[in-house]
Structure formats: structure tokens, C-alpha cells
């Protein structure tokens, strides 16, 4: 079936105008969060600016407004206050936790009911196991759950008497598979096989489902529904709901803690007497609820229905499903020259029906030999193409484990090998630890899907049957030159800006590596560190050091160089302000000294971004390398980065001349610049630095901390700031998905009064494995 546009031209135009910030960006993580529209924020601002909204414990007007929002939200889900109560929470996780700590599994003197959860559930559901007050806790497989659809009602089934709880998602957040909502009624009426005495109540995790699909609670009536509003509207965050069917309210009596506003009376004496309020929301909404965000839901609901009139969520479902199906089929059709698949798709449906499949596509990329490309590399390539997507296991270990065919022992082995949730350790022994997820929303365009598919095709489809050379072939084809030497020294006084190349003599060492390397950084108006990942044109700021001062130049400000004292704070001629600022570099909190207003104005004009500040690293809180406790400046991982020109030459030969996105292949020097190394050496053979464990450069000794894992920074032309797909693509291909090039070094021994001389001989020490 061909792609059919759901929205009219006028509707598409309005949506594009409301999301003008997506003009050159491709956002494909709507399952992570929806995006808010510009008119939506304006409407929220007008609402808040146009009224006096007090604490609801103070103002009856605010109470009435909150009740109106409850009614509107219930109506959004096709139900009414007579059938469901709505309890505001901080999100789906808080709603699930509230059910877990409140659900009564039976009187204390009787055998408790069961807590059963689908294995393909979000981590927040797994966490419920630690709170429920029953020892009868069991997972259920997908096939077992679906079996309840065909389970006939057993007239001989004994009358169930143990209150029990089943939790499953309306839609799997891993791959968008939808579960039949008829299960809610069937299981509450007929129970589950093997649980004869259990009277089940269904808790439906609707967070993923309601983001792009309608939920009709007049037709499907689970006991409990958990959701988050940012999944639907993008804003507000930190606000969710627990919807409780009226006849299930008595089951939520187990919660012991009570907060302000939830009791009729509470005595402060030793007998701890208190009486909870009657209405369920009044009993469970501890303290002051997020009343301004609750009020903001009104313009959020109105904006979405204005942009997409008619049955809004039905139309969004049709639009996003078509996008997902188009993406699925396009990826499925990709082939390597040898006929091999380019992607592994992890799905339970073939995208035949929007009632069984949501707007999520999950996959991993395959090399032409069938081996997997790591998801971290795909994420880097996507970022290099302006594509926002999600990688990992998406807080759904059960679905991830099932689709990647990983046993529990595999997961434990990966954990012992250093892999944890959210890291970039994407392949262990060639086995993927996660996958790539793309998901779609109402503001997603078909061109966004085509952009993703084009990226995968360009970066990963091998069109030639010629394979890469083996390591032995590489070494055999490269002849010896001279003895390895240090041919260039580079330092980067301002993090992520251009290099200062040392052309004569040498350069002094410091406790953190090269003296003044990454001593300064630029932060945005919120204090977040700026890098070329965010602003590639930072490479056009060129530094120099003379007479104890840092001089910054930019081609657009050629007649206005900026001069900064290396040890002080401000520009030459401006008093140094002792204004300390906090920022983060690679998850480390870093203290910096603000270099003053003139410096801030200069970097803002040079980079064309308002509100930037220039900071110098403060010596009051020295930064330390996590593994070794060695002193660090503002560099990312280690004190020094060594790059081998011979290896870069080998890499350049591996990249085809036509693979530079229409541009001429860069010179060797220009390609070396992309790796932003400190110590540029030239050895006899390419890649031999990968085997070194220690390095001697002249009289100075260094310890190898490990290989440098590359990111999309090496795809930025350091002369222009333009991006290309290479050389990251070739590095991944040649090294089996491992994006490593160059090695990190740290100072060993005494560094005092040492200087690294250009032209010094380089000796790598190899420790043979036993």
C-alpha cells in the first residue's frame, strides 16, 4: 500500500510553522518525548500571564481549574468522572509506584494474591516487584499473555477470592508492538491459566501507547491506567496521571505514607492518629500538586486539536503508522552487493495494521559479512547527519533480551565485561548489547524517514564485493621509512577550538599534559560547555600564545584579536573578575573563572551565538582522571592524545575519492587535523601504536591509557566546520564496528622542567600477552 498523506496541505503548513526549529533537523525520538509546538508555548504563557494562580490549598479558583483539567483529560480518553478517578502524579513511573505501594493483595491473615507482570515491560514495572506486598511475584511471557485471548471461560472455575494485579503495556516501548486491549476485560473476567484463585485487576502502562494512539476507556476498561503527558504534548514534563476505575478504588488502601492535604485530621502526638480524605485523588496526591503544569494542560489539549482537527488521535495514529511502515519497508529492502541484509529488524508484526503496531521501528545495522555494527557508531553517524534517534535497550530489558536472543547469562557476562545501561559499550564479542530505535510523531515528515534511510544507505551499504585488507595485508603493503619520530605538537588552549601548532623547538609539560592545553572553554548562557558537536564553526577560532597571554583570532574579526591573560581571568587591560562558574566536562563538574564581558562579547560575535562566556579552568578544584587519579585539564578522557600520521595515511587510502560527500579528498595534514591529537608521530608501519603499552618520546616516558573511541567530531573539516560522513564510516568498517583511532597517554615519572622536543625519537613498548 502506498503512503497516503493524512494531513491536508494547510494542516501540514501549520504544523511546519509551529515547528520551525525542525527546518534542518530530523527528530526521530518521539517515543522518548513528543515535541511541543511554538503556538502551544505561547498559549501556555498567555494562560499563566493572564491570571493569578494560587496554591490550590489556598484558592478555590485553582481547585476548580484543576477539576476542569481532570474532566478534560478524562474526556480525552473517552471516559467521565463517574467511571474513572484521575490522580495526578509526576509521571508514569510515579503512577506505577503508587499502584505498587497501595494495592491490597488481600487481608493480612489470608494467602495474598499474585503480582504478575509482562517480561517485555519497562524497568519501572520491574521496580514494582520491590514494593508489592505479596511474595507471589511472577513474570509472564508475551505468548502466555496473548493466550488469554483464546482462553474460553471455564464455568467450573472456582470463585476467585485473592485480589491480584497484572501489569502489561498497551504498546511496547521497545518496538511499538500493541497488545490487544480486549485482554483487560478478558483477564479480569476469566483470569490467567495457572492462577485459579486469583481475581486479577489489570494495570495498563499506557505511556508509549497514548503518545500517538487513541485510548478509549469507554470501550476498554482496565482497573488502572498509567501515563505521562509529555509523551503526548512534549510539555509539561514532570506530570503524569493514574486513572483508577471507580470500582477498583477500594483496592488502593495499602499506602502508608500521607502528605499535606491528604488527611482530614492528623495528630502530632505519639498515638499517630490520622484520618485520610474520602476522594481518591485527595487521599493519594501528597502535598501541593504541580498545579501550574496541570493548568498548562488546557492549552496543550486545545493546541493539538486545533492543529489536527477531527478525531485528533485517530488521525495522528494513521499518520505516524504510515511513516513507521514506510521506514520499516525501506530499511527492510536495503541489501549489500552480496545480497546480504543491511538491517536486522526487531519486530513482532509486519506493519500490517495500526491496531497491532505503533509508530516505532527498531533495528541494528549489519555489515556485508553479517556482523553487527554497534549502535553507538550508528548514533554517531546519525548525529553527523542531523538525525536525533535513540539507542540502547530503552529501559525495556525483557524485550531487548528476547529480540537480541540474549540469555540471562549473556546479560550478566556483558555486565561483568563493563556494560551498564546507557553506556556506549555496544558490542561484546561481536554480540550487540542494544539496538537503534526511531519513532515518529505528528510533526514528523516523510522526508525525515527518507533522510534516515539515505544515511543508512550511504554509510553502511557496501556496493562493491571487494573486501577490506587483513591486518597482515596492511603491514605487508607498507614499507619502512625512518625511525619513528615526533613530527608535530598541537595544543588546544580553548576546548574544541582550533589548534596551536608548535613548529620549532618544543613545548613544556605540565601536570595535566601539555602546558595550557584545554585550559579554557566556552559555555552557553546556561553554563553548558560548547563543543564542535553543537557548534562546528568553533574550529575557526585560532589561538596563539605570546608573552604569557592567549591571543584568539577569527577570520570574521581579523582586526579584533582577543587577548587574555593565561593566569588571570580577564582580557588585557580589563580587571580580572574572580567570578567562579560551574560547568560539566564529560560528566565531571568543573569550576571555571569567567574571563569578563569583553571576552564574552568577542566569542559570541565570532561564533554568532548570543550569551556565550569564556572560562578559564580554576585551580581550586583540580579535575582527576577516574581510573588513575591523574590531573586533567578540560580534555575529555586523558592527558594526551597520540595520532600516527602513517595510520592516517593508511586510513585515507581506504576512503574512496568519491566518498567525501562531493568534496575533494582532504590532504593528509587536513585529515590529521580532524583527529585533534596532541602528539603527532610518524612510525614505520600503520596502526602499530595500537599495540603499545608505554611510549618513550626523547627523555619523557608515557603510559598508554587505551585507545581513543572516536565520535562525529572527526567528520568535521577543521578548516571550514563542514561535516562529512568520513572518515568515521571507514574506521567502523575497517575495525569491525569499533570506532577507535589513536591512543591516550598519561605522563609517567617526573615531568618537572621537562619539554617535549620536536623531532624526538619515539619508542613504543609492547607487553606481550601470555
From Swiss-Prot:
Q: What does this protein do?
A: Sulfurates the molybdenum cofactor. Sulfation of molybdenum is essential for xanthine dehydrogenase (XDH) and aldehyde oxidase (ADO) enzymes in which molybdenum cofactor is liganded by 1 oxygen and 1 sulfur atom in active form.
Q: Does the keyword Cytoplasm apply?
A: no
The MOSC domain sits at 601-770
Could you tell me what this protein is called? Molybdenum cofactor sulfurase
Q: Give one Pfam family.
A: MOSC_N
Q: Which GO terms describe its molecular function?
A: lyase activity; molybdenum cofactor sulfurtransferase activity; molybdenum ion binding; pyridoxal phosphate binding
Organism lineage reads as:
Eukaryota, Metazoa, Ecdysozoa, Arthropoda, Hexapoda
Which HAMAP family does this chain map to? Answer: MOCOS
The domain of life is Eukaryota
Cofactor(s) this protein cannot do without: pyridoxal 5'-phosphate
Q: Which residues carry this modification: N6-(pyridoxal phosphate)lysine?
A: 231
Q: Which UniProt keywords apply?
A: Molybdenum cofactor biosynthesis, Pyridoxal phosphate, Transferase
Amino acid at each position: 500500500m502506498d503512503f497516503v498523506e493524512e494531513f491536508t496541505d494547510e494542516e501540514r503548513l501549520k504544523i511546519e510553522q509551529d515547528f520551525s526549529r525542525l527546518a534542518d533537523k530530523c527528530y526521530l525520538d518521539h517515543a522518548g518525548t513528543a515535541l511541543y509546538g511554538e503556538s502551544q508555548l505561547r498559549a501556555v504563557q498567555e494562560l499563566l500571564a493572564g491570571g493569578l494562580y494560587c496554591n490550590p490549598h489556598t484558592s478555590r479558583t485553582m481547585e476548580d481549574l484543576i477539576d476542569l483539567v481532570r474532566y478534560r483529560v478524562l474526556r480525552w480518553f473517552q471516559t467521565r468522572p463517574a467511571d474513572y478517578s484521575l490522580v495526578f502524579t509526576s509521571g508514569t513511573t510515579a503512577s506505577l509506584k503508587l499502584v505498587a505501594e497501595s494495592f491490597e493483595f488481600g487481608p493480612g491473615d489470608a494467602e495474598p494474591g499474585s503480582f504478575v507482570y509482562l517480561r517485555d515491560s519497562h524497568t519501572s514495572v520491574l521496580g514494582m516487584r520491590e514494593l508489592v506486598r505479596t511474595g507471589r511475584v511472577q513474570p509472564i511471557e508475551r505468548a502466555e499473555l496473548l493466550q488469554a485471548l483464546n482462553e474460553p471461560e471455564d464455568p467450573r472455575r472456582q470463585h476467585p477470592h485473592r485480589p491480584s494485579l497484572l501489569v502489561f503495556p498497551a504498546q511496547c516501548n521497545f518496538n511499538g508492538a500493541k497488545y490487544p486491549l480486549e485482554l483487560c476485560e478478558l483477564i479480569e473476567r476469566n483470569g490467567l491459566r495457572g492462577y485459579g484463585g486469583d481475581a486479577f485487576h489489570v494495570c495498563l502502562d499506557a505511556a508509549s501507547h497514548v503518545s500517538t494512539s487513541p485510548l478509549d476507556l469507554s470501550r476498554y476498561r482496565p482497573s488502572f491506567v498509567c501515563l505521562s503527558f509529555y509523551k503526548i504534548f512534549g510539555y509539561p514534563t514532570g506530570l503524569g496521571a493514574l486513572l483508577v476505575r471507580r470500582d477498583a478504588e477500594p483496592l488502593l488502601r495499602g499506602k502508608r505514607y500521607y502528605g499535606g492535604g491528604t488527611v482530614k485530621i492528623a495528630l502530632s502526638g505519639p498515638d499517630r492518629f490520622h484520618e485520610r480524605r474520602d476522594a481518591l485523588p485527595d487521599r493519594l496526591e501528597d502535598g501541593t500538586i504541580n498545579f501550574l503544569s496541570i493548568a498548562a494542560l488546557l492549552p496543550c489539549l486545545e493546541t493539538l486539536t486545533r492543529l489536527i482537527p477531527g478525531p485528533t488521535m485517530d488521525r495522528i495514529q494513521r499518520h505516524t503508522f504510515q511513516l513507521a511502515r514506510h521506514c520499516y519497508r525501506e530499511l527492510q529492502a536495503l541489501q549489500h552487493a552480496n545480497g546480504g541484509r543491511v538491517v536486522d529488524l526487531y519486530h513482532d508484526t509486519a506493519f500490517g495494521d495500526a491496531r497491532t503496531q505503533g509508530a516505532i521501528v527498531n533495528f541494528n545495522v549489519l555489515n556485508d559479512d553479517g556482523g553487527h555494527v554497534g549502535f553507538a557508531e550508528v548514533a554517531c553517524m546519525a548525529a553527523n547527519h542531523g538525525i536525533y534517534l535513540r539507542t540502547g535497550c530503552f529501559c525495556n530489558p525483557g524485550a531487548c533480551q528476547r529480540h537480541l536472543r540474549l540469555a540471562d547469562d549473556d546479560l550478566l557476562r556483558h555486565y561483568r565485561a563493563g556494560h551498564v545501561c546507557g553506556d556506549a559499550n555496544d558490542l561484546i564479542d561481536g554480540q550487540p548489547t542494544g539496538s537503534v530505535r526511531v519513532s515518529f510523531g505528528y510533526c514528523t515528515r516523510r522526508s525525515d524517514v527518507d533522510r534516515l534511510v539515505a544515511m543508512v544507505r550511504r554509510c553502511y551499504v557496501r556496493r562493491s564485493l571487494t573486501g577490506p585488507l587483513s591486518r597482515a595485508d596492511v603491514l605487508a603493503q607498507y614499507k619502512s621509512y625512518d625511525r619513528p619520530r615526533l613530527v608535530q605538537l598541537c595544543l588546544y588552549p580553548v576546548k574544541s577550538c582550533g589548534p596551536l601548532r608548535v613548529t620549532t623547538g618544543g613545548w613544556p609539560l605540565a601536570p595535566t599534559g601539555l602546558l595550557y592545553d584545554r585550559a579554557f572553554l566556552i559555555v552557553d548562557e546556561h553554563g553548558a560547555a560548547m563543543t564542535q558537536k553543537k557548534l562546528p564553526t568553533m574550529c575557526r577560532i585560532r589561538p596563539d600564545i605570546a608573552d604569557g597571554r592567549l591571543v584568539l583570532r577569527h577570520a570574521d574579526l581579523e582586526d579584533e584579536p582577543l587577548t587574555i591573560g593565561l593566569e588571570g581571568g580577564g582580557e588585557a587591560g580589563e580587571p580580572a573578575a574572580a567570578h567562579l562558574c560551574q560547568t560539566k566536562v564529560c560528566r565531571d563538574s568543573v569550576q571555571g573563572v569567567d574571563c569578563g564581558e569583553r571576552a564574552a562579547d568577542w566569542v559570541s560575535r565570532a561564533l554568532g551565538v548570543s550569551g556565550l562566556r569564556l572560562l578559564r579552568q580554576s585551580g581550586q578544584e583540580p579535575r582527576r582522571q577516574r581510573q588513575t587519579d591523574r590531573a586533567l585539564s578540560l580534555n575529555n578522557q586523558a592527558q594526551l592524545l597520540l595520532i600516527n600520521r602513517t595510520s592516517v595515511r593508511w586510513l585515507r587510502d581506504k576512503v574512496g575519492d568519491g566518498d567525501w560527500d562531493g568534496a575533494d579528498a582532504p590532504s593528509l595534514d587536513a585529515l590529521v587535523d580532524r583527529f585533534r591529537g596532541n602528539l603527532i608521530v610518524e612510525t614505520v608501519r600503520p596502526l602499530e601504536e595500537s599495540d603499545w603499552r608505554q611510549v618513550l618520546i626523547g627523555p619523557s616516558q608515557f603510559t598508554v591509557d587505551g585507545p581513543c573511541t572516536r565520535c562525529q567530531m572527526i567528520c568535521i573539516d577543521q578548516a571550514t566546520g563542514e561535516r562529512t560522513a568520513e572518515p568515521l564510516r571507514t574506521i567502523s568498517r575497517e575495525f569491525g564496528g569499533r570506532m577507535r583511532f589513536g591512543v591516550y597517554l598519561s605522563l609517567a615519572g617526573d615531568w618537572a622542567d621537562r619539554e617535549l622536543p620536536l623531532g624526538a625519537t619515539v619508542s613504543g613498548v609492547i607487553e606481550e600477552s601470555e
